[in-house]
Regions:
Chain A
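Glycine-rich, flexible loop/turn motifs
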Residues: 58, 70, 92, 109-112, ...
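Long C-terminal interaction/binding lobes of large macromolecular proteins
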Residues: 130-142, 147-200
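Conserved phosphate/pyrophosphate-binding and hydrolysis machinery centered on Walker-type P-loop NTPases
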Residues: 2, 20, 39, 52, ...
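Signal for well-folded cores of large energy- and translation-related assemblies
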Residues: 17, 35, 50, 63, ...
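Cys/His-rich Zn2+-binding cysteine-cluster or related metal-binding knuckle/ribbon modules and their
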Residues: 2-9, 31-84, 89-93
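Extended interfacial segments that mediate partner engagement and assembly in macromolecular machines
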Residues: 27, 76-142
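S-adenosyl-L-methionine-dependent methyltransferase catalytic core, i.e., the SAM/SAH-binding region
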Residues: 10-18, 28, 34-37, 65, ...
Length: 200, 368
């Protein structure tokens, strides 16, 4: 790119482009926006990125993102502690919690079983989930992995492990578009999916 | 259904080809290597998103970094527009009536085609893979559920085969394999069921067409050949056989049965045509099969597909040529490539004709 004989600008664009959902054009727009902004604003942004990065950790119980460990969901007294909803990513907790239709606990397994990406059960927080089920008084596990091939395989795999423990296992209803991911499903669809969950 | 306009940009040897007004019968003429087949292929691609190449990249015009094909469509009284663009880079962009469509399965089937080409003979002579591909493209154009099941099956199969291919390094977790097998059976059974139903319809239409061409002397049939014994509950039979084959699959590092291993046999007088049909018989058989494809689509969606004819009169004497053309006369839209355009024009005096040269339009002579 001859039009930018400016190494630092190219570097900034490259860094921005690494983020999910950001293509080269958007990366350029963001970079120019930042350069046009007041220095104080840019410092505020850089500061908040660093601060969040330093303060936010994974909850040692459910692997949600949190500043305080265990997280607010895990320590809440207003939640139904006999219900665990299993999701792939911390993002999915936000989507499901916003529906207000689910009042139980969560467990993030950090991905899905995907041989093509070299991810097996041992790479996920599945052992931790089984330990939780053994320790806590769990009556039902709702599996809310994504409705794609890997998410579906993870759901089948989990139900085979959990059912023998005498715990009810259900799957989020197929109200969601096939291959879609939870974070993009709207709240109404998700709420319906929670209510209409089917037992596995 | 009818294609009312076509615009092709950088597709194979075609630089820019703008055909704003298409007719019922469209004759495409030009010298060897001018781009006649490529013009038909662009319509085929616009409809099915398939080319004879392994990658879309190979269809990008040498020296260019993208291609696009656009078409206007009249389908049961409605006007539609379709657009597909590949590159720069590797992304495929699909548009329907100007709106971006994210999934192929929401696009394929909007424009439906049957392509008659010289290499159709490979359907009889070639590998099972070629026959499966023909079935997949045919059924996908009229049944989106089929395409979705097929896509799911292919995705699950890729995961499972990856597990199996690494089995020598690391013994696969039986529960993980089972999680993929369960999905494989579900989508695979659906694919087989729909293919078998299609084969039953196709076989009848195939025999009828073939009888008409062979003057009732020969009987032709198609038989869907499943890679495992698929009687009773398909899904259960598939699951049981996979369970039985698990050790063998682990040893071989791949999935041994399923719709990706099935075949469709062409038979003439009860014998497999691959071995027992003469060259001429094989030509007539594939021709009859293509006509059966047409009937299948017509029956499934109550609408006629667009017909692409690429020099199918090659090797036929005048009487047979005339007889073959009679099959096409009642169909609403034909694109005919022929080196003997004058002769075709006599048969279809109202046809529009387009002369292609060097991948572009040389002149458009439209008869009123
Ligand atoms: N990606 C590409 N870029 C440029 N040219 C290409 C590309 N792919 C194929 N071609 C060329 O396009 C030319 C025209 O091909 P096409 O098959 O359309 O000819 P045709 O008019 O049907 O000729 P014939 O009468 O011999 O069948 C071929 O010479 C082929 O090499
Ligand atoms: Mg040709
Ligand atoms: Zn927590």
């Amino acid at each position: 790119m001859e039009s930018y004989n400016n190494a630092s600008l190219i570097k900034l664009i490259n860094e921005l482009e690494k983020m999910p959902g950001i293509g080269p054009k958007t990366a350029q727009r963001l970079a120019f926006y930042l350069l046009k902004s007041e220095k104080a604003d840019v410092e505020k942004l850089a500061g908040s990125i660093l601060e969040a990065k330093e303060k936010i950790k994974y909850c040692s119980v459910c692997f949600n993102m949190t500043e305080i460990d265990p997280c607010a969901i895990c320590t809440s007294l207003r939640r139904d502690r006999s219900l665990i909803c299993v999701v792939e990513e911390p993002m999915d907790i936000v989507a499901l919690d916003n529906t207000g239709a689910f009042k139980g606990l969560f467990h993030v397994i950090m991905g899905s079983i995907s041989p093509l990406d070299g991810i097996g059960p041992e790479d996920l927080k599945i052992r931790e989930l089984l330990i939780r089920i053994g320790k806590e008084n769990i009556k039902e596990v709702i599996i809310a992995t994504n409705p794609d091939v890997a998410g579906e395989a993870t759901a089948i795999y989990l139900s085979k492990l959990i059912k023998p423990l005498g715990v009810k296992v259900s799957r989020l209803a197929q109200g969601m578009p096939m291959g879609g991911s939870l974070e993009y499903a709207d709240e109404v669809t998700l709420a319906r999916a929670i209510e209409g969950r089917r037992e596995l | 259904m009818r294609l009312s306009s076509l615009f092709v940009h950088n597709f194979k040897n075609i630089g820019e080809l703008d055909l704003p007004q298409l007719s019922g019968v469209n004759i495409i003429t030009g010298r060897n290597a001018s781009g006649k087949t490529n013009t038909l292929q662009s319509i085929y691609f616009l409809s099915t998103l398939s080319t004879q190449f392994k990658t879309y990249q190979q269809a990008v015009r040498f020296g260019a970094d993208f291609f696009s094909v656009k078409g206007g469509l009249e389908s049961s009284g409605a006007q539609k527009s379709l657009e597909v663009r590949y590159g720069p880079g590797r992304d495929v962009k699909l548009k329907l009536n100007g709106n971006t469509v994210a999934k192929k399965s929401d696009y394929i089937g909007e424009c439906r085609v049957v392509n008659f080409a010289f290499e159709d003979i490979d359907l009889v002579r070639g590998t099972p893979g070629e026959r499966r591909r023909a079935l997949n493209i045919l059924i996908s154009q009229v049944n989106r559920g089929y395409l979705k099941s097929l896509q799911k099956y292919t995705a699950v199969l890729a995961h499972k085969n990856k597990l199996l291919s690494e089995a020598f390094k690391k013994r696969p977790d039986a529960a993980v394999l089972e999680a993929f097998n369960e999905q494989l059976c579900e989508s695979g059974a659906e694919v087989i069921k729909i293919r078998k139903e299609a084969a039953v319809f196709l076989s009848q239409a195939f025999d009828l067409a073939h009888k008409r061409i062979s003057l009732g002397l020969e009987s032709a049939s198609l038989e869907y050949k499943c890679s495992f014994e698929c009687v009773g509950d398909l899904k259960a039979a598939f699951a049981a056989k996979l369970k039985e084959l698990l050790p063998a699959e682990i040893a071989r590092g791949t999935t041994l049965i399923g719709p990706h291993k099935d075949d469709m046999l062409f038979k003439i007088n009860g014998r497999e045509a691959k071995y027992y049909a003469s060259d001429g018989q094989q030509r007539t058989l594939v021709f009859s099969f293509k006509l059966a494809e047409y009937r299948y689509m017509q029956d499934a969606v109550k609408d006629d597909p667009v017909i692409l004819l690429d020099d199918v009169f090659y090797e036929l004497d005048a009487d047979r040529k005339a007889a073959v053309l009679e099959f096409f006369r009642p169909m609403p839209q034909l694109f005919i490539v022929s080196l003997e355009a004058d002769w075709v024009k006599k048969v279809f005096p109202d046809a529009a004709s387009f002369r292609i040269s060097g991948g572009a339009l040389q002149d458009a002579l439209q008869k009123e």
